[in-house]
Amino acid sequence: MQERQVDIAIIGAGVVGLATALSLAPTGLQIALFDAQPKPSAGPQGTALNDWDRRVTALTPESIRFLKSLAAWSLIEESKRGGAYTDMLVWDSEGTGQIHFTATDLNIDSLGTIVESSLTTQALISATEASSNLSSHWGTRLESMDIEAESVRFTTSSGDTVIADMTIGADGGRSKSRELAGMRTREWRYGQNAIVATVRVQPHHSHACWQAFLPTGPLALLPLANDDLCSIVWSLDDALSDHWIQADHDAFVAGLNRALSGRGPQVLEVSERQMFPLIQCHAVDYYHGRFVLVGDAAHSIHPLAGQGINLGLSDAQTLGNEIVWAHQRGADWCSPQVFSRYERQRKGDNLGMMATMQAFKWGFGSKNPAVTLMRNIGLNSVDALPMAKRWFVQQAVGAK
């Protein structure tokens, strides 16, 4: 057991925690990452159906630019496992409403890139290991935490005590650090789970995403780097998700194809499936003393727009910019003014996206015929109006 002093401690070494550390590295401050899980093994390998990570993220062009600035994107590019997509088709399964987005609507090369979560994590780990002022402590749980006037003191499962000038909570939606800091949240349960898997399709996906809004919840088909493989995210009410996670292979494939109703490619084969609960949670405050929240620890949303990880990366970039700016000018880089600027910039965007997801959930979950009619008219109207369509595309790819 020992006492360790660092400038900045980050609890949680997932994508957002690692990106936050890298965004702060230019300060030269001593930054230590702590994660309860063992260090992940090498990123995904192989191209067979079950070799692909079932958890993927739809990284926007803005997130990709940020990862490039952290020297983390090159490993993803070299792996040739990122699936860039240029088109997105969204439709209402209960009517005729649909929107077709294309990259040309924004005069860009692609709307984003589908990347396995484990690959993004591995790329960021490699980047942190190349930075002399970053250290990572894997398999180290947070046990207790005290927020003091000039520091944050916490103990870990190894028995060590860490004293940090500031601490960042990046440990996910069920954040232990947020709980120990006594920070309040507002939480909504959707009563749904998401089933994720990799599927083989025919014909090839042609670098397009498909999203069907079903009465039971949205189904997304996301193109992977191999042109005959897609990742699925199927959000279903609790009882239905329990049924479909246990369904045999052929029944599940048939269920997917019925849900897609011929709008997307035909699903031929499905990998092993995983399921996780859907919860929306938002911290009332993003900081308390010298403790700050980022990513899902501050806000977690429904995955239907694929924006969760992009919002978290925006948190990491904004907090990093504010601290680096203050440090370069010799100001107090862990002052309430710095943290307040971060919160002010990020809270509005995060709340706006959460409200949009809640509206989509209500609008497409309603069985009221009048609501069904209005949403179909709305979808078709947006598809026919270039300015409105451009705005929706900008929201989908996180463009300003």
What are these model-derived regions, one by one?
Residues 321-400:
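C-terminal helical "tail/cap" subdomain of flavin- and related membrane-associated enzymes
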Residues 6-33:
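N-terminal Rossmann-like FAD-binding beta1-loop-alpha1 element of flavoenzymes
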Residues 51-93:
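N-terminal FAD cofactor-binding segment of flavoenzymes
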Residues 242-334:
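FAD/FMN-dependent oxidoreductases across multiple families
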Residues 16, 39, 174:
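Conserved Rossmann-like nucleotide-cofactor binding loop
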